[in-house]
Amino acid sequence: MDLDSLKYAELQRLAKEVGLKANMKAERLLKALKEHFSQQQLSENGNDAAASDAHDSVPPVDAHAATYVTERRGKGRTAKRKLSEPTPIISPTEEKTPQDEGRRGSKRRKVSSAKDTQTPVPAEAFAKENTMEKESGDLNPDSESGPTETGVKGRRTVGKIPRHKGLMKRKPAMRPTTPNFKKLHEAHFKKMESIDSYVQRKNKQMEVLRNSVKELKTLSEKTLKKPEAKAQTKVPSSRASLFSPAVQKTAVPERRRLTQQPVSKSALKDTATFRPTVLTTNKINVRFSQATQDNEYKRSLVKTPARMSPHMPLTSTPGRKSDVRSKAELNRSASTITKTPGATPFVFNGNNSISTTPGTTKKNTFDLKASLSRPLTYKPHKGKLKPFGDAQENTALNKSQTVPSHQKNYKQHQVQTREERRVKHTEDRKQKKEKMLGARRGLVMA
């Protein structure tokens, strides 16, 4: 068979076996294969005189190339395995035709394998032998004479020196070598820093962090102190707490000990340093039995304002607004408290302004004129109003209409007709269409 009669897949396989590029167009592949085989044949004829003597009956170059292709048509490996039988090489054109005619009836695969077994040796075996001899340097002087020796040579190329071993010999870098782990570990240890240096570095880092934290703390303390000083100078807010907070030692009484204030100064300055800690009056126990002995007889648990200590007495009737002691007297009493060596555990420094207690505060009365003078917050209705009776009748009618049909006539149940269903269906479709359009236009449908 010629190369022209082979299929594209077979040509590709042949090219791969020979060692050519197989991924080409059919015409170019054919051309390349023909060139390759012709060159191979020429080199064989030039190099091996014994091969030319053995093959007297070989046809011209093109025919031989064609027959050679048919030899390499099957799987190459199977052919190599079956080469163990020493068979004398016979010309392919003479003896192949009767065998092929006999076996065509059975199976075509057997034909290809038989062809492979008969003649993979003559053309390629010599080429392989030449190359391998150059590499390995085999010394066989009488291997070039005789057809039987060529068969032995072919056997040797296949079995004795496999291709993989040759490649391995050529490329020693491909061999898997186990690394010297000791050297590797030593190199790694050299790269690593010592424990002492590591500890020093860590300590330095920690010191830097601590210093930064200390700086931040000092800054925050300074910033906190500044607003405190400002708050002390400020006038007390009008909204003073009703209840006594936790005991706070203020700076004002200490000053008083050193220098007595004149009597004319107001009592409001006593509350200058007071900052209310209690903002809600819920859940506060109001009994100060130890501190306030005058309220001992009162056992009620009603949440009332904090009972004042005996040092700050009020008038006899707390219900109504009464004549409160003058500011000077209050000031005097406060100064006496500070002067006495305090045996009392609790001193009330809270709400000195008695006007703010709930007993004394007067509720605001409604001012009609002021409310009428203010503008309206709503829009008033203009025009005639509907009569009251008609509106009531309408509501009754609506109510009767809203009663569902199955409640109205439960004895004779109304079956839903086809027309009603159609109407309902059309309405549903309309609604769906509207929703779709709204969604498409980016409108949010409620």
Curated annotation (Swiss-Prot):
Single biological process term from Gene Ontology: establishment of mitotic spindle localization
Start-end of Basic residues biased regions: 153-173
InterPro entries attached to this UniProt entry: NuSAP
Residue ranges with Polar residues bias: 399-415
Coiled coil spans: 197-223
Compartments reported by the entry: Cytoplasm; Nucleus; Cytoplasm, Cytoskeleton, Spindle
Region (Disordered): 39-179, 224-250, 399-446
Keyword Magnesium in annotation: no
Keywords noted in UniProt: Cell cycle, Cell division, Coiled coil, Cytoplasm, Cytoskeleton, DNA-binding, Microtubule, Mitosis, Nucleus
Subunit record text: Interacts with DNA and microtubules.
Entry similarity comment: Belongs to the NUSAP family.
Listed name of the protein: Nucleolar and spindle-associated protein 1
